[in-house]
């Protein structure tokens, strides 16, 4: 779940998983050549430990294994002039009888927040989830103190189903809740 969210509006696009273009960046499926740029986004977000439940010392190899998804999931990027500004990933939230519900995560490089990138990544993933036949999307662990992300996901139709109290140990403010958020597709 994104937690490096932004709140700026993004131009409307068709409901398709094809590459989407905004006034200033494109969102498209990631390629192997995008990995260095994806890692440049992931690493600082993970190291701060404020918005994702990953270990702060996650290695590049571990991150790649966890972030890069296979169909029906996918990994995607927001790019401008060949520079990866942000990235997202989409996958089934559970296996078996729960595999019809999607889960996604998003990260935006700190230098590019406030440009509508997280909104565009989320919109892309919602379209991709619909196209892949998912019936809903669930975010399992939106950090309660990440109010920008919480606001953004709510503005995009997600609702908070529950909050697990003190489930996240924020490195600066201590224990905070994790929201479970949901949207029917």
Named regions from a protein language model:
Residues 129-142:
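Conserved GNAT acetyl-CoA-binding A-motif
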Residues 40-57:
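Helix-loop element at the rim of GNAT/NAT acetyltransferase active sites that forms part
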Residues 113, 139-149, 167-169:
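Conserved beta-strand-loop-alpha-helix junction that forms the acyl-donor binding cleft
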Residues 114-129, 151-155:
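Conserved acetyl-CoA-binding loop-helix of GNAT-fold acetyltransferases
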Residues 2-23, 106-107, 164, 170-185:
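Terminal substrate-recognition subdomain of acyl/acetyltransferases
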Residues 26-38:
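A short beta-loop-alpha structural element at the N-terminal edge
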């Amino acid at each position: 779940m994104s937690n490096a969210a932004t709140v700026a509006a993004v131009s409307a696009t068709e409901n398709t998983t094809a590459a989407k273009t905004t006034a200033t960046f494109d969102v498209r499926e990631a390629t192997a050549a995008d990995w260095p740029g994806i890692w440049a986004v992931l690493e600082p977000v993970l190291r701060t430990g404020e918005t994702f439940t990953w270990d702060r010392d996650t290695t590049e190899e571990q991150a790649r294994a966890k972030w890069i998804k296979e169909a029906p999931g996918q990994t995607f990027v927001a790019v401008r002039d060949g520079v990866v500004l942000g990235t997202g990933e989409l996958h089934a939230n559970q296996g078996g009888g729960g595999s019809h519900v999607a889960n996604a995560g998003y990260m935006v490089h700190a230098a590019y927040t406030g440009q509508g990138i997280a909104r565009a990544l989320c919109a892309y993933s919602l379209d991709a989830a619909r196209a892949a036949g998912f019936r809903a999307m669930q975010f399992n662990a939106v950090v309660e103190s990440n109010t920008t992300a919480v606001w953004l996901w709510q503005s995009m139709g997600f609702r908070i189903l529950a909050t697990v109290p003190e489930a996240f140990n924020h490195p600066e403010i201590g224990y905070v809740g994790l929201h479970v958020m949901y949207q029917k597709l």
